[in-house]
Amino acid sequence: MTPVRDMRSVLYATAILFALAILGLRGAFIWFEYRDALDRARAATQDLALLMEEYTKRTLETSDLLLGEIIAFTRLRGGVGALSETGQARQFLADLTRRSSASDLFLIIDKEGNTVAVSTVQPASPVSFSDRTWFKAHRAGAETFVGAALVGRIANEILYTYSRRIPDLNGEFDGVAQVGLRPTFLQEISRPTESDAEDATLGIWGREGRVIARTGLTQDQVSSSLGQTSLFNELASVPS
């Protein structure tokens, strides 16, 4: 006959082992749930990144075609200098805006960096963009340029830009055709959902780390950069 004390010891040991088994199973379930949550978060992030990439690509392709129409219109009428003598350019840009669902503000800039035509209300006097990075790039020979986020001098709101160099009949620099784009798409796809999407920050950054578009971006953050961060440098080193 087993002594009562030994029986109690066996029962205590069994209870302890059972409790440890329960804790082990619970820990395993928590680990599996954690791994599953990570996998789902990773998949959702990849889906968002692909969606943003495709949208950005299509937006820039559409903008490129529309800017091509502006360049053709400009050259057909004798160049950028000739456009300042009539109001046809502003009307053409306004019509182009109505035909486009993605583009918000069209500009034609002369070779000195001053506005010749704007798709919105024409400024009382020409606005100079000669100090902008994109203008300097085109004057130096760049055919196209995707600009970082900025506060528009005409729209006075956060935009990112895509522009093309306008050549004259001899191929020399005659000005710039540009479209300013609002990053509304990022705000739309980052609306809060049951998956805690409100904690996600969506953005597009240039090769040097300058922000092009980002959710929650404020005017005092448009010059921010990720260029010196280890994460950006690691991503930049991955072959495309």
Residue ranges and their predicted role:
Residues 42, 60, 82, 86, ...:
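Solvent-exposed, acidic/flexible segments
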Residues 47-54, 65, 69, 91, ...:
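Generic recognition of well-ordered alpha-helical segments
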